[in-house]
Curated annotation (Swiss-Prot):
Upper lineage: Bacteria, Pseudomonadati, Chlorobiota, Chlorobiia, Chlorobiales
Listed GO CC annotations: cytoplasm
Cofactor binding notes: Binds 1 [4Fe-4S] cluster. The cluster is coordinated with 3 cysteines and an exchangeable S-adenosyl-L-methionine.
Gene: rlmN
Designated name of the protein: Probable dual-specificity RNA methyltransferase RlmN
Catalyzed reactions: adenosine(2503) in 23S rRNA + 2 reduced [2Fe-2S]-[ferredoxin] + 2 S-adenosyl-L-methionine = 2-methyladenosine(2503) in 23S rRNA + 5'-deoxyadenosine + L-methionine + 2 oxidized [2Fe-2S]-[ferredoxin] + S-adenosyl-L-homocysteine; adenosine(37) in tRNA + 2 reduced [2Fe-2S]-[ferredoxin] + 2 S-adenosyl-L-methionine = 2-methyladenosine(37) in tRNA + 5'-deoxyadenosine + L-methionine + 2 oxidized [2Fe-2S]-[ferredoxin] + S-adenosyl-L-homocysteine
Length: 369
């Protein structure tokens, strides 16, 4: 029986150094391997010219350099009119994840939205991924491979490379903290080809308090986005079940500490859902919650998901909500929904490609406007 090969990028530098020592090689070989992968983008041990042929062979017998591949049985990237691109990747265990490339209309900024888990344990009611349940965490290598693969594609197809990374794909990144942190450290390492500053990395969380505290403790000054979606406790509990464990008051307290540690605004993501969270009273509650927090509001046009009984807010409701927020001193941006037509926008990561799971129509409550 052939030995199952593992992705060498799943190892931290320290773990790889220990492994290299166990092979009777000097520990600095680990740094050479990392340099080949992350500075030069090689995908084969045979390309690592300063390693002996025998050592290259030994590594190739036990490890691979790349752990993801685009799906062969589906369109791995589909071009929309705005040139948003969805990538569907197959992992070594036949699970699937998605990444979304979002170019800027007016600048050279190239943003990649990446996944951190297969599925998600937090079961947000408006999100297709939440109905998958949690399958597993992504490894360090699987997280980084999304950036490596799209960088190669981008260089071949359009020129340039990824400049911004947002952990807003499948999964809760702060529930896969160690692997996401290790990936961020590599993405921001000036010795490697990514050369992405921490200010251009955004970690989005549903409000997982232990993870936010760990993020504060690390000193990693990346941007923080909170999937808030309501400042009404009962409504937020309906939308985001973890809110039953971590209340809005608890969330506000930890975000105040985050503001004290990092002098940059927190982004509150707010999907406007008709008759759920889009009334003027909802806007007033949002402004009260935000008082005392250095923050901005990113309003999102809700993208309808098959079999989930939520609807996007009508334009009139949206504009009234925005006006009320501005009246109360909030900084508001509206995220252009780019990629909904290819099931790539928030909440649209294609559940059917992950493990063929279907879910029945979800009934949701309605709140008066």
């Amino acid at each position: 029986m052939n030995e199952v090969k593992h992705d060498i990028k799943a190892l931290s530098l320290e773990a790889l150094m220990a492994l290299i020592n166990s092979y009777g090689q000097p520990a600095f070989r680990a740094k050479q391997i990392f340099h080949w992968i992350y500075a030069h983008g090689v995908t084969d041990f045979a390309q690592m010219k300063n390693l002996s042929a025998s050592f290259q062979t030994l590594l190739s017998q036990h490890f691979t350099v790349s752990s993801i591949q685009p799906h062969a049985d589906t369109v791995s990237h589909e071009i929309t009119p705005e040139q948003t691109v969805k990538f569907l990747f197959r992992l070594s265990d036949e699970q699937s994840i998605e990444s979304v490339f979002i170019p800027s209309d007016s600048t050279s900024r190239n943003t990649l939205c990446i996944s951190s888990q297969v599925g998600c344990a937090f079961a947000c009611k408006f999100c297709a991924t939440g109905y998958m349940g949690f399958i597993r965490n992504l490894t360090i290598g699987e997280i980084l491979d999304q950036v490596l693969w799209v960088n190669r594609w981008l260089g071949d197809q359009r020129g340039g490379k990824i400049t911004n990374v947002v952990f807003m794909g499948m999964g809760e990144p702060l529930a896969n903290f160690d692997n996401c942190l290790a990936a961020i450290r590599i993405l921001t390492n000036p010795d490697y080809a990514f050369q992405i500053s921490t200010r251009k990395i955004t970690v989005s969380t549903v409000g997982f308090i232990p993870g936010i505290q760990r993020l504060i403790d690390t000193g990693i000054n990346c941007k923080l986005a909170i999937s808030l979606h309501s400042a009404h406790q009962a409504i937020r509990e309906e939308l985001i079940p973890i809110a039953k464990e971590y209340s809005l008051a608890t969330l506000k307290a930890i975000l105040t500490r985050y503001n004290q540690a990092y002098k940059q605004p927190i982004t509150f993501e707010y999907s406007l859902i008709h008759k759920i969270n889009d009334s003027e009273q909802d806007a007033i509650l949002l402004s009260k919650f935000c008082k005392g927090i250095n923050c901005k509001i990113n309003l999102i046009d809700y993208n309808s998901v098959d079999n989930i009984d939520y609807l996007p807010s009508p334009e009139g409701h949206k504009q009234a909500f925005i006006r009320k927020c501005i009246e109360h001193g909030l900084t508001v941006t509206v995220r252009k929904s780019r990629g909904a037509d290819i099931q790539a926008a928030c909440g649209q990561l294609a559940i059917q490609h992950v493990h063929g799971k279907k879910f029945s129509k979800i009934q949701t409550s309605r709140h008066s406007t």
